[in-house]
Amino acid sequence: MFQSISWASLTVLSLGILIHFCSGLGKGETKPKSNTKIHFIGWCGWAEDLGILGKLKRLAGVVAFLSLLVMSLTAFSGRLISNELMTGYALMIHVGTAPVFLVSAVFLLVTWAHQCRLTDAERAELVAHLCFQHVKTKDSLLLIKLTFWGAMFLTIPASLSIVAVMFTIFGTHGQELLVGIHQYTGLGLVLLTSFHFYLIIRRHFK
């Protein structure tokens, strides 16, 4: 079941990103800005004139993304191909990378929370979208902010559920339920984070 849901959701995300990217190419919206020297991690907003905190925030984002990528490869490679759980070195790498991701995610939450709050205009835009009303917005950050908060929210159950599995007070059935929570919230975290970074990269080259 989890294998099928993972394949389906990753396929939908990939197709959605591809269609969205191609539609932007048709409108000429994905060309990099001219006369601008792009840093090798410039896609995350890195600039030489940033302060120390600004550079740390962007480095934390890169570290969080890379660590989540490592955890995704170790976790989903076996499940997607042979529907098997992690064992051996894959499990060790997954567990060893998790603290790096958590520390980076907490730092991102603390430092980006204020900038990612929804403005009055963005709240009105969100309500309009929920009511299926057409809204014309230019350079809206609504999707970027929503995916940021969604990823941060899913980080909590994804982390706590796997820690709780280590305690026997939940019983066998409870531990199986917690593993399921960890798997599905982890999948949601990967999907939201991937889409969030795609939106950031696309906005940078828009």
Model-identified regions with their sequence ranges:
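Membrane-embedded alpha-helical bundles that constitute the cytochrome b-like, heme-associated redox core
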Residues: 1-206
